[in-house]
Amino acid sequence: MTAASLALADRDGFLKALDGSQRITKPYRHWLMKDILPLDQAEALHALPVPAPSGLTFSGRRETNNVTRFYFNAEAHEKFPATRALAEAFQDPKTIASIEKECGIDLTGTSLRLEFCQDTDGFWLEPHTDIGVKQYTMLIYLSKGKGSEDWGTDVYDQDLKWTHRAPCHFNSGLIFIPGTDTWHAVDPRPISGVRKSIIINYVAPEWRARHELAYPETPVT
């Protein structure tokens, strides 16, 4: 397949998954999806030859290990066709329009940010809402192996009471629109192997770390 056809396949796979998503309103609006990407593309992203970070400090916050984080930016796109295809799919105007309609948001002027996460045993995240500069948050779960279906995101209510855990089957995912009540976490649990996921954000123009962006000079229009 050509680069363009890979991107279109990713786009159409996501749009189908979004249309068939499970829409949940409590404790805040979020969407659960399955079969998000074409299976071969999901497998290619899972198999990216990027070593999982080691020697990390687990503090409940990703920023503690900022120097080891991996983004689907211009450098990654030159090396890995699968990352380029995913970025093009989520920069596509049809994708943007569908997200805006489904989620009731306006992404004009935002920039696409995609992070490839490879979490190992000991990793956890404290309850947080996502910072305000993030206008959209989505996770694609790409884990395999024993127990990986239980490695999903934990959802909390505004009183920080646990409500449920997103299913974490391979190529499934979660969407929410960050707000003051969108508390979520990754509670401590055994991770046998590597917990792989992709975090997709559209971030506001004031985002400073431009190297993290898929297209730092091309905001959504």
Describe the residue ranges of each PLM region:
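Intrinsically disordered terminal extensions flanking catalytic oxygenase cores
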Residues: 1-6, 211-221
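Non-heme Fe(II)/2-oxoglutarate
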Residues: 3, 9-13, 17-102
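Catalytic core of non-heme Fe(II) oxygenases with the double-stranded beta-helix
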Residues: 78-91, 95-217
